[in-house]
Amino acid sequence: AGFDMDLGGKDIISVQYQNANNSVRVSDEFMRAYENNEKFGLVARASGEVIETVEARELFRKMAEAAWACADPGIQYDDTINDWHTNPETGRINASNPCSEYMSLDNSSCNLASLNLLKFLESNGSFDAKNFVKSVELIITAMDISICFADFPTDPIGETTRNYRQLGIGYANLGALLMASGLAYDSDGGRQLAGAITSLMTGTSYRRSAELAGIVGPYAGFARNAQAHTRVMKKHANASASAKSVTSLDQDVWQVANKEWEKCLEIGDKNGWRNAQASVLAPTGTIGLMMDCDTTGIEPDLALVKFKKLVGGGSMQIVNQTIPQALKKLGYSDETNEAIVEYIAENGNIIDAPGLKPEHYDIFDCAMGIRSISAMGHVKMMAACQPFLSGAISKTVNLPSDATVAEIEEVYYEGWKLGLKALAVYRDNCKVGQPLSDSKGAPTDAVAEAAH
């Protein structure tokens, strides 16, 4: 209709709240009412009185309908969040940051840092757990020191952060790591490797935190929360110890992770911990690009070939740079590798690529496109990693444009059943200002070629 709705366009600002994240917090009581098709009392936040009684399924359906239409609201599971809370004696967790990965005390903050997982993939195809542990140790130490020199927007935020010293180490490029390892994102092998790496990261972080506590003391709020903090550490450790490996690749990482959790509990029992929280999985949308990552956070690749809208008009074609590495891992020759990459760049997908075996198709499945990962594939990946995080996971469960409201409702329900703390959904093309897509839609001004 003549409106300029591109990113940075003069008319896009008329569509308010397009760049805001809105979530609804639900309790176990509400979810059980949904399961049993019962009524639920909506409670006033200040007084605690029931102000309206509604049909739980009707309200849940309205949430799904809204998310179908515009990708909001996301959902947060209150009881799960607070069951993994290390500081309940200080206060409950009432809210999160906008992306829903940092969940802690009111008036607190958390510095974030992320590791590029693909950098730890060795030439023989194994994951370099030894150097990963060293990197986590270094970053956790540096992040804790940074709190001493940080400025905060308000005095209460500064006071709470210095007293509880929450940290948020995480990672990016998981999707690329799995692809380069010849593992499908939506596979038991992919999920178990992701879970093992996440467990290793958080176990190492808390072990280092306990060591720091022995030198400079535990966080100020530890004494009153010692029992709860220790309980949560044991929950993490037990989840790691009970994990079942699928491949030799994840088995090796689980072994190192479990040793880290054992040391974490042993040292923490003596010293306490320096930090109330240690890990989250953030979106890494900006820093992931700066680290030359193909995939952000815990996400799979959006598409093998994608188009990023540019502020001011036009778009940039981005071809996944991990494809050649994955094909080499799978045993394809250089000549076949080059032909497949060229086919993908021209066609945007791998179907009928010359020389590519159909049994390898799922390794290249992405969030969007002809061969897209199912919604539950996203949710199961989150569930594989959530038990090994202090905070939550900022992740989008991508659905095709023809997805139904019922499918979104199922995603929200299964997220609760699988023990997630939060999740968000995005149905393709449900927003007018969509920065990434798997189709051009605008003249290409620049091309990022795949590395050969």
PLM regions and their residue ranges:
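Extended, hydrophobic alpha-helical segments in both membrane/secreted and soluble proteins
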Residues: 171-176, 205-209, 323, 393, ...
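Catalytic alpha/beta core of large soluble enzyme barrels
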Residues: 101-103, 143, 147-148, 214, ...
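Active-site cavity-forming subdomains of large catalytic enzyme subunits
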Residues: 1-135, 145-162, 183, 192-194, ...
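Core structural elements
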Residues: 140-146, 160-182, 283, 350
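Catalytic-loop motifs flanking and including active-site residues across diverse enzymes
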Residues: 108-111, 167-173, 201, 319, ...
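Ferredoxin-type iron-sulfur electron-transfer modules in oxidoreductases and energy-metabolism complexes
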Residues: 189
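Beta-sheet entry/capping signal
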Residues: 65, 72-75, 109, 164-169, ...
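Short, positively charged, Gly/Tyr-enriched micro-motifs
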Residues: 186
